[in-house]
A protein has these predicted regions:
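Chitinase-like catalytic core of GlcNAc-active glycosidases
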Residues: 5-195
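Substrate-binding cleft of secreted/luminal carbohydrate-active enzymes
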Residues: 210, 215-363
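Solvent-exposed serine/threonine-rich low-complexity stretches and specific carbohydrate-binding patches
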Residues: 96-97, 430-443
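Extracellular beta-strand ligand-recognition surfaces/modules
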Residues: 409, 447-473
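Catalytic-core regions of glycoside hydrolase
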Residues: 155-251
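Short carbohydrate-recognition loop motifs
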Residues: 362-391
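Short, surface-exposed beta-strand/strand-loop-strand elements in extracellular ectodomains
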Residues: 417-429
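Extra-cytoplasmic beta-strand recognition segments
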Residues: 379, 391-419, 450-452, 467
Length: 473
């Protein structure tokens, strides 16, 4: 189900992102301020690399648990960081030699890295090797040690992704294991399918093994159209991209002057974070906040080339439209706390399309932190309804309905009777849809709760969840 003509599925995005202002100041359970952030457009990502580590603060850094949870609920891999910096930034070859230590014929730190990832529930490691001191053959054997024990324990998704500032794939490294990948130097996005025979894999598998680097921290969050054109042209994908620290431009620029001040909470923080979410939208979707828009000339947004991913394939599925950030804490529509907060671990799966509204005509969708049913935010749709239907596609799904079930919609509206639920039973933009009717309706703390019986869909598959906003005049 394509939102625009230039979308394809094959190419992947690896997001090497900062998640905290500094490596050593990383709260495990969020904090009571309004400045925290992590990406919310997981539908355009395949892997998350926690970009952290420094010679003075630590070089082995597991990803935050909440971020791993948020990534996993959208089907995105989460990788920690082993950071061997260049000597100019304090890197030491002796650290690499220690990592490659063998005892009784085994790479003991490869085993330990697996044990850490297994215990903490993430999917492997990004090894930034710019210090030198190790040979290709040693790293190949190190990776084989890591994945050998992972495979033996059933963790076949475990991955090591390597980076050493090389502009072309290290064939021996990438061939180490079926899950091994490489982040190539900045300026290297291209079509790498011709490496399939060399790597002993299919062309389709090259997309998950070779990523062309894009230094977004320098180019800006909308400054790498050329990289998209090289790897993901409008007529089909040839390669994948690794984005280096887009959050520096999307988020950190907005909040860095507020960190550690009284403005970590309150109006200045709200203003800064509104800017963050606009910038995030501009990069992942486009400046119009509309994935149906295809710009063949300017910045197309990632949605202009990437087909949205979804893992929603069974019941129950629940979302509160929470971005992991709040001015208040809500429980069933009741405001129970007025302290600013953030916590990445309570982030909801946000809509697959942000936002795809047919017959839009001035309707605007935004994240509302002032009113919510649960957690800290809701979606607010604002504007005047013109006559007719205004279909808002929310979630791409593949949910088989075998024994009924219930769809529960919690909402507020100033126009009674204007909201209905439509479910697509074909995976087509213009495919068959079922409009749900006769809900059981209750009210709680000012919110309408509509519950729809799904037994009429038995034997069918739900491919999309949408809302239709309608008006007779």
């Amino acid at each position: 189900m394509k939102a625009n003509k230039n979308q394809f599925y094959e190419g992947q995005i690896c997001n090497a992102t900062i998640l905290f202002p500094t490596c050593s100041m990383c709260p495990s359970q969020g904090a009571n301020n309004f400045l925290g952030y992590q990406p919310t457009y997981w539908q355009y990502m395949d892997k998350l690399v926690y970009w952290a580590g420094s010679a003075s603060e630590g070089i082995i850094i597991p990803p935050p648990a909440g971020s791993t949870d948020a990534a996993h609920q959208s089907g995105v891999k989460s990788l920690g960081q082993v950071f061997f910096p260049p000597s100019a930034f304090g890197g030491r070859q002796e650290w690499v030699r220690q990592m490659l230590t063998k005892e009784n014929g085994k790479y003991i730190y490869a085993i330990k890295l697996y044990e850490i990832a297994k215990y903490m529930g993430f999917d492997g490691w990004f090894i930034n090797e710019e210090s030198g001191g190790g040979s290709t053959s040693e790293w190949v054997d190190f990776i084989k040690e890591f994945n050998g024990i992972a495979d033996a324990n059933g963790d076949t998704q475990m991955e090591i992704q390597g980076y050493n500032a090389a502009r072309s794939p290290n064939e021996a490294i990438v061939k180490s294991h079926k899950s091994t990948s490489q982040f190539l130097e900045y300026g290297s996005p291209d079509d790498y399918r011709n490496y399939a025979d060399i790597l002993g894999c299919t062309e389709a598998e090259t997309f998950s093994k070779i990523y062309g680097g894009v230094q977004v921290v320098n180019s800006g969050h909308m400054g790498y159209t050329d990289a998209l054109d090289w790897a993901m042209p409008v007529d089909g994908h040839g390669g994948s991209l690794a984005l280096f620290c887009p959050e520096e431009r999307i988020w950190k620029d907005n909040v860095k002057s507020l960190l550690g001040t009284k403005d970590e909470c309150g109006e200045n923080a709200y203003l800064a974070q509104r800017k963050t979410f606009y910038k995030e939208r501009d990069m992942w979707v486009n400046q119009y906040g509309d994935p149906t828009y295809a710009d063949d000339f300017g910045w197309p947004g990632l949605s202009g080339r990437m087909l949205e991913r979804s893992v929603i394939s069974s019941m129950p599925f629940e979302t509160s439209f929470c971005v992991g950030l709040g001015k208040h804490r809500f429980v069933e529509g009741e405001k129970q706390n007025t302290q600013d907060w953030y916590h990445s671990g309570v982030q909801s799966i946000m809509p697959t399309w942000r936002y795809w509204i047919e017959n839009k005509e001035g309707l605007d969708v935004s994240i509302d932190w002032d009113d919510a049913y649960n957690f800290g935010s809701s979606l607010k749709i604002k504007g005047k309804l013109t006559a007719g239907d205004h279909l808002m596609r929310l979630y791409k799904t593949m949910i088989p309905v075998t024994s009924g079930g219930t769809l529960r919609l919690v909402y507020k509206t100033s126009t009674p009777g204007s909201v209905e639920v439509r479910l697509a039973t074909e995976s087509k933009v213009k495919g068959e849809m079922v409009t749900l009717s006769n809900p059981t309706v209750t009210d709680k703390n000012g919110w309408t709760i509509a519950e729809y019986d799904l037994s009429q869909l038995n034997g069918k598959t739900v491919y999309m969840i949408s809302l239709n906003m309608k008006s007779e005049t």
